[in-house]
Amino acid sequence: MSLLNVQNLTVQFYNKSEIHEAVRNVSFSVESGEIVGIAGESGSGKSTVMRAVMGLLPDGAEASFERCEIAGGRQKAAMVFQDPMTYLNPSVTVGRQLKETIQVHYRRKAKRMKTDSRDGENRSMRKRLSENELESRALELLDMAGIRKGKELMRQYPFELSGGLRQRVVLAIALACEPELLIADEPTTALDVTVQRQILERLRRISVEMNMAVLLVSHDLGVIATLADRVLVMKDGQIVETGSAGDIFYAPETEYTKELLRSAAGKSALVGKMVSDRETLKIEKITKNFRIADGMFHKKENNAVNNVSLRIYEGETFGLVGESGCGKTTLARIVTGLLEPDSGALHYKGVPFPSLKKGRTKEQTRKIQMVFQDCSASLDPRCTVREILKEPLRIHKTEDPGEWDEKIEDMLVHVGLQKKDADKYPYAFSGGQRQRISIARALMPEPELLVLDEPVSALDVTIQGQILQMLRQIQKEKGISYLFISHDLSVVRRMSSRIGVMFAGGFVETGKTKQVYEDPWHPYTKELLAAELSPEPKKAKKRISSVTEETEEPARKASCPYAPRCGYVMECCRKERPGLYQFGDREVACFLYSEEHTGKRGAGYRMTSQI
């Protein structure tokens, strides 16, 4: 008997007089220890199927089926959701939330054993675990989820953790239920490539060690190829193709699956070009520190951005990549004036640009706009799209009020929406459509530089392609410069003419995108590129088998921050932080490129990769 058996599942949503059929006649099974991936675009019904299996459909939804059974009941299944912050209580420590789950599961297990026992052997089983037992079990689960400093982490709140750590905490909470089936709904969306690989490797390891089945839902074909043994492809609420990972990725039968694979393969196309040598933005030696809590009475200094300099030219896209917490978003907020740097300066077309607190004018603010990562959080759910797009016009007064409605409707058409969408609310749109609205709002005051912070991280490959194509077209028509921030290396490669790789608050390598991708000079850049997920199962599984989970923190401020993870570390790396060595269009922060290491350089010296 299969661990999970679903036959002819149909899910309908009722909205006033309308009925929407989200899932139609879906059938599949999952065996013990098997990893099954469900792929498809946003809105294809993947998450709805998972929620129906777990009995978590919202009010107004109705599921019908011939069979939807989990061997042993739903208590044998657990679910890891896409956004861990939505399911973690921000006002309760991680340790308390984990211990609560352990205690509840223990009570239910004891109750079942007592009910099922015929000879009374289990009737004396305790109803509660002691605090020491809870602590021990919590640390064991955190270790299983790949968290080494469990005691320290249990005292922290969810908002104090990085995205990767929050996802590991949710995984530990799910494992507390001792599931035989783990449903993972987009578990690595919006995580950087190195953390993605670590989470996926951890899931595979747990599946093997516990003989636990995993039902993996993702719009990212690289994630599916990396982990899944068998793949189901969904479109418009139906399964259109099923087969082994090898069959689906190397010999797809349906045109829809072929189109998905073409979209994933097309992500790596190089299209970014330099179009001007006229400088738009100049950043000089920007530094930003934050004081964060370290225990109850002490604070420690976090060096978020360290001595960063860069230039962005008219009509250019400069790509910014790096893992979570490296300082990308902090730098973006400094550029837009939302944060004030501790030191350094910004110049816009040769004119000093202060922060908003230091008196940046409305005209200066208008010239630099930002598109935020979470479009749902950045759009007011109480306002219509028309009201949202009117706000920047009202603030900057760039148009006559009588022309606002016409400009709003024209802008919606420009970003691929319809004029009639102006009077709808944000909840009526898909994720890709909401991101188009966010971009439209940023374009309303006619900026000259657009800061894009992870604009497509949570979107499937086909919607990603549409958004990126739209951004390129807008750039071509208006000559806008982009500061494009992403953890997705293939997206940055597709958009950028130049790229900067950040680690621990500073640049470790900059250069033309093609040069950096084809011939990385810094060991960290090489690590990032090696961690990129491939939509080919043979490559993906081979790569993940060699992943090691790094537990070292970046080194102290006086040394190279990458030294604890570097395979080329030298004695000087432990004593001093390297500056950026410049060679034509390229810069690299590594002592391997110093004169002391490579020798004196005469006229015409040409540096090559030292790794």
Report residues per predicted region.
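P-loop NTP-binding/switch modules centered on Walker-like glycine-rich loops
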Residues: G55, L191, V195-S268, L449-V451, ...
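Helix-to-loop junction immediately C-terminal to a conserved catalytic motif
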Residues: M54, T336
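A short, proline-enriched helix->beta-strand linker immediately N-terminal to the Walker B motif
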Residues: A176-E180, M444-E448
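Conserved ABC ATPase "signature" region
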Residues: K114-E152, G402-K420, L529-A530
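The feature captures the beta-strand-to-loop junction immediately N-terminal to the Walker
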Residues: A39-E41, V321-E323
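Conserved ABC transporter NBD signature motif
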Residues: E62-Q75, G344-F353
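Charged, flexible cofactor/metal-binding loops and thiol motifs
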Residues: A245-K282, I292-F297, E301, K512-I611
